[in-house]
Each structure stands twice: as structure tokens, then as C-alpha cells.
């Protein structure tokens, strides 16, 4: 234990816009050469939707007793805990994995490590109105009970 197989990168203040213009917008344009100026502008300003954006990175540490999968789960738990903590303090918070979470060029820029993977970006900000509740699965369809006979 105690490996901490994850990293946290915080974007706040001007770093949100700098990263957007220097990397997100530029990379989006490379991937979508026919994208409209409005679409590129949207990507450049994506991180401005919240006061703070937290990037959680799964960064497995070689270990003979702990499988990679468990380390990846640890990174996801970090995301969920940040989300729950922010919401419990009254902030609006959302965990997103959009195109840039899976882009190897963006991941390399952020981590400088080919083995790292982005677990998600958590947007945290002031709650202006109550967010819409998403459709959730019916518990009876996803929960079962094992009983020994």
C-alpha cells in the first residue's frame, strides 16, 4: 500500500485560459482542421466554465503485489472523493471525461509520462442554480443479491 498511484493537476486563475489557448484549442484545431472559429473558441475557453478545474491522472507505480487495475480504481476514487467533498462544501462540481481526457498529446503535455492516463477533469465552481438531475438506472436492474442455497 501507500503507493499513491495518481497525480493531481490544478488549473485556477489565468492558468485555465492559458492552457485552453495554448493546448486545448490548438490541439482541437489539429484534430478538426475544418472546425469553425466558434468551435475552436469554445475549446479554448472550456476551462473557464468553472473557477477551478482539477485533473486527476492515473499514474501506476510498478508493484509486485498490487495490480494495475487496483491502482486505476484508486485514481477513480480520488475523482469521486474530490467531487463529493466539493459538493458537500456547497460548490457545484462535475467530473468529466471529454475528448481531451483521451488525447495522448494532451496527456503527454500534462504528465510527460506515456504510462499515465487521465481519469477525469473535475470542474468546481459557484453554484448559480440547481443542476438538472441526470437519468439514473433503476436499482432493480443493476443490483442483485447473491444467496446461498
What do the PLM-derived regions correspond to, one by one?
Residues 28, 48-61:
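Acidic-glycine-rich active-site phosphate/pyrophosphate-binding loop
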Residues 26-35, 65-69, 109-110:
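Short, surface-exposed loop/helix-turn segments at secondary-structure junctions
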Residues 38-41, 106-109, 130:
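Glycine-rich, charged/polar anion/phosphate-binding loops
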Residues 1-49:
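N-terminal amphipathic, basic helical "cap/leader" segment at the start of enzyme domains
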Residues 118-149:
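C-terminal helix-cap and adjacent tail motif
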Residues 106-119:
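Short, electropositive alpha-helical surface patch
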Residues 54, 60-107:
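Small-aliphatic-rich amphipathic alpha-helix that forms the alpha element of a beta-alpha
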Amino acid at each position: 500500500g501507500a503507493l499513491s498511484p495518481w497525480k493531481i493537476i490544478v488549473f485556477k486563475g489565468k492558468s485555465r485560459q492559458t492552457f485552453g489557448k495554448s493546448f486545448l484549442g490548438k490541439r482541437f484545431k489539429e484534430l478538426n482542421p475544418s472546425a469553425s472559429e466558434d468551435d475552436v473558441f469554445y475549446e479554448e475557453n472550456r476551462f473557464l466554465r468553472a473557477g477551478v478545474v482539477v485533473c486527476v491522472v492515473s499514474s501506476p507505480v510498478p508493484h509486485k503485489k498490487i495490480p494495475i487495475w487496483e491502482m486505476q480504481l484508486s485514481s477513480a476514487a480520488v475523482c469521486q472523493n474530490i467531487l463529493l467533498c466539493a459538493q458537500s462544501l456547497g460548490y457545484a462540481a462535475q467530473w468529466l471525461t471529454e475528448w481531451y481526457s483521451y488525447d495522448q498529446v494532451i496527456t503527454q503535455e500534462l504528465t510527460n509520462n506515456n504510462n499515465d492516463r487521465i481519469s477525469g477533469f473535475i470542474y468546481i465552481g459557484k453554484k448559480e442554480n440547481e443542476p438538472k438531475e441526470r437519468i439514473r438506472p433503476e436499482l432493480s436492474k443493476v443490483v442483485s443479491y447473491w444467496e446461498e442455497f
